[in-house]
């Protein structure tokens, strides 16, 4: 199987990665990818980007070398209603997102979280 895009990556901006956008784009191009989604952590994650970062994504070029860049976020689903930790004023600048369940699911435990998904309710 040949992959054409990496849809989940972090740069220095997320606080725990080690590469710049330019370095990551060069590595993606060297691997033969066509696109790279930069999905920095949303503000709820300690030590990561603030809202200001997401509100300024429109100034980042959408191409670096031969790689198409997709600006995005790794958001956290905060509760059963599907509320996420990136307000619309930041999320509206994102072209791509990935999501994870926040600590409410961890507190309830694995069984309850799975059962909740079976009932079409996000926990």
Model feature map: region roles:
Residues 2-4, 35-36, 70:
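Hydrophobic "anchor" residues on beta-strands that sit immediately upstream
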Residues 4-15, 38-41:
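Histidine-centered catalytic micro-motifs
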Residues 8, 28, 40, 69, ...:
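Divalent metal-coordination and catalytic microenvironments
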Residues 16-20, 111-112:
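Glycine-rich anion/phosphate-binding loops
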Residues 25, 29-32, 119:
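Non-catalytic positions within long, well-ordered alpha-helices that form the structural scaffold/packing
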């Amino acid at each position: 199987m040949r992959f054409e895009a990496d849809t989940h990556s972090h740069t220095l901006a997320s606080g725990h990665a080690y590469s710049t956008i330019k370095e990551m784009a060069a590595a993606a191009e060297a691997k033969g990818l066509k696109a790279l989604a930069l999905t920095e952590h949303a503000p709820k994650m300690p030590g990561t980007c603030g809202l200001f970062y997401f509100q300024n994504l429109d100034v980042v070029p959408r191409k670096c070398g031969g790689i198409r860049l997709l600006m995005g976020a790794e958001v956290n689903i905060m509760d059963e209603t599907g509320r996420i930790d990136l307000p619309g004023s930041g999320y509206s600048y994102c072209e791509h997102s990935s999501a994870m369940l926040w600590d409410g699911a961890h507190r309830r435990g694995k069984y309850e979280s799975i059962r909740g998904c079976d009932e079409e309710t996000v926990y």
